[in-house]
């Protein structure tokens, strides 16, 4: 089926400054309050609310382009459509190919023809990308402000598309450019690294949760506004799927496990290692919890992508995000727009988004999570929330919890018992379909029997998930056993010792609850 692609853009934005010559970042938008509007649920047959004259003129022109005449058609006589709204995370920033006129100099929405909305497997005649790099919720909500002179407020664009097509899915990715200021924070972190000014975690960590708490109501109101737009266009809430998609982490600390790691300068991983740990383990998870809360309170379908790029971060073997990138083709002197593509999903990242969205749409789920399990390069949708899936495992004999030593997820890290706490390095998820045990630190590290040594005394470690025999385990009561050697059990011989294989004997030291 041929799709007509219309584009726009999005924000989370530009990150990394260029060596010393920056200090700027992605940019975009301005705040704005949200108008609280509630519309009664309409049937699909209900007449739409008339648009303001200026928007109606645009709608009529677009209808003529699509159908050959300007009138608004009944839903069942329209072409089907998908639409994405939001910021740079979904506009296509970072892909490298952009639709005119969104590649400057007066419009930097950076909408890509390879953005996720254009690449799903969801059957649709038309796809629309009205997101814009740098957008915050004030550029999306009802009564908001356009980012550029040739742009509409994104909710107005939705109102037009909803009257000219039968919209099947509305995708929203927003919030990073509100209180969080993700782009400026990333820019500052990179600048501090390039200028040897010290890690940025101490600067931002104390107020990070407050930033998340501040953006949640704005995202919630934006979702409600989009519902209102659709109701005013004659849709019942059940006529389409409204998806709020969470953000993945573009960075992580395990890039040195890449056997072909070329160095940070080459792959663009400009940042302190400690900041990559904080970003993956704390900053992005806190943001994810806020987005999940916004979806739950508004009834939107939620797609948790917080672990989607695990194993595919900047500088890994198969990165789904772009590292620090300076666009030397941009006319004029280097500025924030020269680096705005940095630390955004690349074409493979958008392909991953598209796959997750396709699976989500087909599933009918109201909440789901997506990740690449076992390094296949193919995202898999799970009918669960990652926050609910990962749990501690406590040893019955010692009272210790199964722990990743020093909260380090590098290949070869020991797995041991330790005093229980709330850290992610003590949470685990057992994938019953694949029999793998994943650490809460990253979806890309699994419990591993090194070198397939299924003998007594072998110590368990973390390793890049691959789904091989030495990473498959069975649950038998409260015991965990290698699937290839079910007569041996994971055992903690004493407090704070490494977990080792021993012949199963039914003792408390082999039971984890």
Where are the regions a protein language model picked out?
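Oxyanion-hole/transition-state-stabilizing segment in secreted/luminal serine hydrolases
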Residues: 149-211, 249-254
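Serine-esterase "nucleophile elbow" of acetyl-processing enzymes
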Residues: 60-133, 190-191
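A solvent-exposed, charged loop/short amphipathic helix patch at secondary-structure junctions
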Residues: 96-108, 184-214, 257-278
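Secretory targeting and sorting signals
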Residues: 1-41
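Structural recognition of the beta-strand scaffold that forms the well-ordered cores
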Residues: 81-93, 126-131, 168-173, 178-180, ...
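Extracellular glycan-recognition/adhesion modules and their associated mucin-like linkers
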Residues: 381-409, 425-455, 470-496, 511-513
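Low-complexity, acidic Ser/Thr/Pro-rich repeat tracts that form intrinsically disordered stalk/linker regions
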Residues: 32-76, 80
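Catalytic His-Asp segment of secreted/periplasmic serine-dependent ester chemistry enzymes
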Residues: 248-367
């Amino acid at each position: 089926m041929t799709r007509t692609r219309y584009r726009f853009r999005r924000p989370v934005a530009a990150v990394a400054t260029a060596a010393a010559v920056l200090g700027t970042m992605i940019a975009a938008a301005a705040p704005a309050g949200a108008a609280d509007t509630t519309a009664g649920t309409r049937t699909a047959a209900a007449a739409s609310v008339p648009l303001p004259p200026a928007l109606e003129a645009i709608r009529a022109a677009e209808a003529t382009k699509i159908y050959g005449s300007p009138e608004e058609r009944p839903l069942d006589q329209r072409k089907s459509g998908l639409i994405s709204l939001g910021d740079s995370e979904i506009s296509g920033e970072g892909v490298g190919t952009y639709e005119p006129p969104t590649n400057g100099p007066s419009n930097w929405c950076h909408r890509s023809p390879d953005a996720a909305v254009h690449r799903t497997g969801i059957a649709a005649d038309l796809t629309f990308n009205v997101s814009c790099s740098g957008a915050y919720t004030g550029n999306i909500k009802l009564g908001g402000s356009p980012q550029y002179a040739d742009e509409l407020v994104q909710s107005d664009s939705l109102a037009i598309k909803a009257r000219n097509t039968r919209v099947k899915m509305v995708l929203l990715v927003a919030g990073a450019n509100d209180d969080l200021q993700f782009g400026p924070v990333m820019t500052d972190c990179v600048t501090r690294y390039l200028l040897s000014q010290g890690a940025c975690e101490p600067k931002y960590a104390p107020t990070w949760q407050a930033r998340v708490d501040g953006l949640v109501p704005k995202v919630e109101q934006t979702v409600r506004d989009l519902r209102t737009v659709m109701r005013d266009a004659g849709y019942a809430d059940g006529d389409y799927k409204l998806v709020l998609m969470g953000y993945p982490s573009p960075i992580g600390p395990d890039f040195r496990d890449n056997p072909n790691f070329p160095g940070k300068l080459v792959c663009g991983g400009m940042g302190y290692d400690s900041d990559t740990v904080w970003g993956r383990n704390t900053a992005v998870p806190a943001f994810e919890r806020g987005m999940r809360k916004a979806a739950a309170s508004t009834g939107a379908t939620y797609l948790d992508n917080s672990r989607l790029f695990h194993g595919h971060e900047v500088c890994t073997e198969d990165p789904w995000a772009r590292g620090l990138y300076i666009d030397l083709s941009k006319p004029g002197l280097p500025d924030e727009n020269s680096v705005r593509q940095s630390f955004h999903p690349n074409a493979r990242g958008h392909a991953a988004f598209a796959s997750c969205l396709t699976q989500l749409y087909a599933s009918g789920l109201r909440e789901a999570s997506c990740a690449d399990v076992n390094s296949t390069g193919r995202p898999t949708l799970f009918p669960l929330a990652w926050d609910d899936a990962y749990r501690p495992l406590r040893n019955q004999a010692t009272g210790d919890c199964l722990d990743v030593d020093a909260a380090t997820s590098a290949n070869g890290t020991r797995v041991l018992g330790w005093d229980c706490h709330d850290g992610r390095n003590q949470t685990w998820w057992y994938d019953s379909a694949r029999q793998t045990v994943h650490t809460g630190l990253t979806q890309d590290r699994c419990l591993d029997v090194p070198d397939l040594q299924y003998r007594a005394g072998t110590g368990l470690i973390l390793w890049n998930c691959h789904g091989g025999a030495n990473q498959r385990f069975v649950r038998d009561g409260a015991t965990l056993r290698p699937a290839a050697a079910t007569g041996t059990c994971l055992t903690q011989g004493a407090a704070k010792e490494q977990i080792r294989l021993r012949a199963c004997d039914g003792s408390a030291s082999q039971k984890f609850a």
